[in-house]
Structures are given as structure tokens and as C-alpha cells.
Amino acid sequence: MYRILLTGFLPFGGESVNPSLEAVRSIQVEFPNVELIRLEVPTIFGEAERMVIEQVSFCRPHAVLCTGLASGRTDVSIERVAINVDDARIPDTAGQQPLDVPIQPHGPAAYFSTLPIKSIAQAILS
């Protein structure tokens, strides 16, 4: 069984809906031997990371796809690089607003996706 972990954030910043979570909820898998595991994560620094790590340890997925909302964007964006810094434009739902704080102090400055992001974006937008 091929397991895919999909994450989406709960609403924050005064919004009643988070499109990332709605997208995760709406995806239907129709492939044999594919198990889709959905995880709703809070918009709380540290807590979201803890929950994803815990779920990865528990279900041992073959792939992890984390979705999120980038306010102001009108199209789907696939990110190639995850920067190892928490830097919040607005406070999270617990009132935390870290600025230039390393997520993993001893980790690399950034993490690069190994997914074919251009073909994924093209498939989503077509």
C-alpha cells in the first residue's frame, strides 16, 4: 500500500475557511493500493510541526504533501523550497508572531522538494 500524507491548515487570521484544508478534504483517491491520509493542522507555530512529525512517525507515508494559504495569491503555487525560518506576517491563532526564528536550529537553511513541481502545477492548472 502506497501511503500519502496530505496536510491542510485550519482557518486563521479572522477567516472562517482555509482553502488549503478544503482542498485536502476534497481530494478523492481512486487508485488501487493508494491510501490517502489527511491531517488537519492548527495554525500554531510549533504545534503544526509536532503534529506532522508525529503522524509521519505513526503512519510512515511514502510521500508528504503539505498545503497552505498564501494570502493574496489567485492561483495554486507549488513551492520548490521550504525555508528553515519562522517569520510571521500576522500572529498565529495562539497569538505567537515569530520573526526570523530558525525552525530547526541545526538544520540546513532550506529544504528542496524532490517532487516534479512544474508538472504538478501544470496538471492542477489544466
Which residues make up each language-model segment?
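N-terminal catalytic or cofactor-binding beta/alpha core of small enzyme domains
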Residues: 1-126
